[in-house]
Amino acid sequence: MAARAACVAVCRRLQQITTSDEPDTLYKRLSILVKAHDKAVLDSYEYFAVLAAKELGLSIKVHEPPRKIERFTLLKSVHIFKKHRVQYEMRTLYRCLELKHLTGCTANVYLEYIQRNLPEGVAMEVTKTQIQQLPEHIKEPMWETVSGEKEETKS
C-alpha cells in the first residue's frame, strides 16, 4: 500500500512539470570574473565554484589576472603640516572562470547556485557569449547578389 502511495505521489509531481517547445539558448562561453580583497576567501570560493562545475560535468578553466592596487595619499592634518601624510592602499584580487559550450538551462542553474553561495566581500561579473543563427539577409553571399544586379543594369 505504501508503494502505491509513493507511485501516486511521483505521478502527481510529473504532471506538475511543464515543458516548452521553445529551443534552449546556447552559449559559446560563460566568463565569470570574481573580485575580492581577501586572498583566502577568493581561493575558497574558486575551489567551491570549480567543484560545483565538475559535479555538473562542465569543463572549466581558471586563470588569475594581475591584481589591481589603488593608493590614496592624504594629509594627516586637515589644515597644516603638508609634510605629514598618510597612505592608504586597496588591493583587489581577481579570478576569471571560463565555461565553454553550455545550454541556457545549465548556465542558469550553475550561476544561481554559485551566486547564492557568494561570500561577503566578493563581487561577481558574468559575461555570456550566445550562439545565434545568421540572419537571412547575411546567409546568401554578397558577391552573388552584386553580380546579379550588374548583369541586370548592363542589359
Curated annotation (Swiss-Prot):
Single GO cellular component term: mitochondrial small ribosomal subunit
Protein keywords: Mitochondrion, Ribonucleoprotein, Ribosomal protein
Residues that span the membrane, as ranges: none
Listed SUPFAM superfamilies: Ribosomal protein S10
Location in the cell: Mitochondrion
Primary location group: mitochondrion
Gene3D superfamilies named in the record: Ribosomal protein S10 domain
PANTHER family linked to this entry: MITOCHONDRIAL 28S RIBOSOMAL PROTEIN S10 (PTHR13334), SMALL RIBOSOMAL SUBUNIT PROTEIN US10M (PTHR13334:SF4)
Known partners and oligomeric status: Component of the mitochondrial ribosome small subunit (28S) which comprises a 12S rRNA and about 30 distinct proteins.
Family: Belongs to the universal ribosomal protein uS10 family.
Name of protein: Small ribosomal subunit protein uS10m
Species per Swiss-Prot/TrEMBL record: Rattus norvegicus (Rat)
